[in-house]
Structures are given as structure tokens and as C-alpha cells.
From Swiss-Prot:
The keyword Ribosomal protein applies. Involved in the binding of tRNA to the ribosomes. GO terms for biological process: translation. Pfam families: Ribosomal_S10. InterPro entries: Ribosomal_uS10, Ribosomal_uS10_CS, Ribosomal_uS10_dom, Ribosomal_uS10_dom_sf. One of its GO terms (molecular function) is structural constituent of ribosome. PANTHER family: 30S RIBOSOMAL PROTEIN S10 FAMILY MEMBER. Part of the 30S ribosomal subunit. The gene is rpsJ. The keyword Magnesium does not apply. One of its GO terms (cellular component) is small ribosomal subunit. Belongs to the universal ribosomal protein uS10 family. This is Small ribosomal subunit protein uS10. Keywords: Ribonucleoprotein, Ribosomal protein.
Length: 105
């Protein structure tokens, strides 16, 4: 039996600031719900931690080091049965610059 493949938009969001990421996710889900599309998410993915070890002194003291870390928070939102209104509303949506957005159809 042949089944019809459902149309789906997958939106991946990445940010260093968790609160900024969550507000962006809320805006996307609200926009999808206003245009009668079914939004699933935001689904939290594991946070990536990158730790940098730096010498404190420019000269001799190798024992004295300092650690810095960056945390990359990630979320996925799936939008099922998107209409042209949904796509237009998502294109016009104003999101902060600190959030990286990747869209797949």
C-alpha cells in the first residue's frame, strides 16, 4: 500500500543563552498554532559543553591554569501540515540575533 507522506518542517535552534532560546521557541510555536498548523515541541536536545584550559601566567607557572566553558543549548520544533500562511508568518518572524536557526522541509 502506498501512503501519503506528511509534509513537515523541522526547525533546529541553537543558542548560548537558554532563556533567549526558550522565548524564540515560544514565538515559533505560537506562530505555527495561530496559522492552524500542528507544532510539536520544543524538544530539548543534550547541551554541549566546550571547556577551554588557559595558562594564567604568560611566563613560567604551568601549574596555574584557568578553565572557561561555553554551553550550547539546542531545541527542535516540528511543524506538521504547514500552509503557505505558516511559511510566510515564520519568514516574517523577528527573532533575536543570538539564536542560530536551521530549517529543513
Amino acid at each position: 500500500m502506498a501512503t501519503l507522506q506528511q509534509q513537515k518542517i523541522r526547525i533546529r535552534l541553537k543558542a548560548f543563552d537558554r532563556r533567549l532560546l526558550d522565548t524564540s521557541c515560544d514565538k515559533i510555536v505560537d506562530t505555527a498554532n495561530r496559522t492552524n498548523a500542528a507544532a510539536v515541541g520544543p524538544i530539548p536536545l543534550p547541551t554541549k559543553r566546550k571547556i577551554y584550559c588557559v595558562l594564567r601566567s604568560p611566563h613560567v607557572d604551568k601549574d596555574s591554569r584557568e578553565h572557561f566553558e561555553t554551553r550550547t543549548h539546542r531545541r527542535i520544533i516540528d511543524i506538521y501540515q504547514p500552509s503557505s500562511k505558516t511559511i510566510d508568518a515564520l519568514m516574517k518572524l523577528d527573532l533575536p540575533a543570538g539564536v542560530d536557526i536551521e530549517v529543513k522541509l
